[in-house]
């Protein structure tokens, strides 16, 4: 059985209910808004975040309406953030399809993102849980702060792993942390169990982002985007940060600063990609992923008793670290 089938096995019925509720949340009678929402609904991914919420809820109790509305609210919040991110990053593509801003324009994309965000707040309110409502509201602030922190890090000359992890923990890892935490909260887990679930989610999110960053050093035919795309956007990720710090190569550091100032050429990016591969950057990032994997496994061994959920969450961890795209 493949990873995704293992992940879905304990929550197949609950996942179907989630998809129905989520799709209904993105329906509208207005022509333009309806078209834009249909466009977004058609690019549904693997549902990794909702599945994590459902699995954690089932681990600590059961999936309820509180769980489902919270899951829809969080996925809508994430969706809205992606629509807005594409405007900020001037991205023309999202999950292999034209982005909302590319299909329509920035004004429409911002308004559609705002509508989805409002719908997210509505669904979270249906949870009737002050704790979950507050957590989702705070998550929105954290994600926005993460974007600002990333913009600041690009314009800052400093190159460090600490800043790299600070950004991740307020972006990708914050989302996974919230999924695990909200799943546990919705099942009325104890405060300790909720905190441990959050740590598990954060580890998952860090692994997810490092894997994404490793993909950026390989051919576009393998991963569906240009090699060195992050550097084109002014971002220095873990593999190249390690290679720069471990070698102290001044010529490469000069190129790295050109990346951050958006003055780098494609040939210079290719040099940095080759330099990173030749100096252990990929191997180091891979090792760090497995370190976070080990931390995440300790949660499963301590807090997950049901063997089907254990296998599903183990498959989830393994999928995130071993995925090919």
Where are these regions (language model features)?
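All-alpha prenyltransferase/terpene-synthase fold signal
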Residues: 1-325
């Amino acid at each position: 059985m493949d990873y995704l089938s293992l992940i879905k096995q304990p929550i197949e019925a609950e996942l179907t209910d989630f998809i129905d509720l989520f799709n209904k949340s993105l329906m509208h009678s207005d022509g333009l808004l309806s078209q834009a929402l249909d466009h977004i609904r058609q690019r549904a991914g693997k549902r990794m975040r909702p599945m994590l919420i459902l699995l954690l809820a089932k681990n600590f109790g059961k999936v309820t309406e509180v769980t489902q509305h919270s899951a829809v609210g969080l996925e809508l919040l994430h969706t809205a953030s992606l629509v807005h991110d594409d405007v900020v990053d001037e991205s023309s593509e999202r999950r292999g399809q034209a982005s909302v801003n590319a299909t329509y324009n920035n004004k429409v994309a911002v308004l559609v993102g705002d509508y989805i965000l409002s719908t997210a707040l509505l669904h979270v309110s249906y949870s009737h849980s002050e704790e979950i409502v507050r957590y989702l509201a705070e998550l929105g602030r954290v994600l926005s702060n993460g974007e600002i922190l990333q913009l600041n890090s690009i314009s800052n000359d400093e190159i460090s792993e600490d800043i790299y992890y600070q950004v991740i923990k307020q972006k990708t890892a914050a989302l996974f942390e919230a999924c695990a935490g909200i799943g546990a909260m919705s099942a009325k887990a104890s405060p300790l169990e909720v905190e441990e679930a959050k740590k598990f989610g954060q580890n998952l999110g860090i692994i997810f982002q490092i894997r994404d960053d490793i993909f950026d050093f390989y051919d576009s035919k393998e991963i569906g985007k240009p090699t060195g795309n992050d550097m084109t956007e002014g971002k220095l990720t873990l593999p190249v940060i390690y290679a720069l710090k471990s070698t102290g190569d001044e010529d490469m550091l000069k190129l790295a600063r050109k990346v951050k100032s958006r003055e780098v050429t494609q040939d210079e990016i290719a040099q940095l990609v080759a330099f990173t591969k030749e100096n252990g950057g990929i191997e180091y990032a891979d090792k760090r992923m497995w370190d976070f994997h080990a931390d995440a496994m300790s949660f499963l061994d301590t807090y997950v008793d049901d063997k089907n959920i254990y296998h599903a969450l183990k498959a989830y961890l393994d999928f995130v670290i071993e995925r090919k795209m």
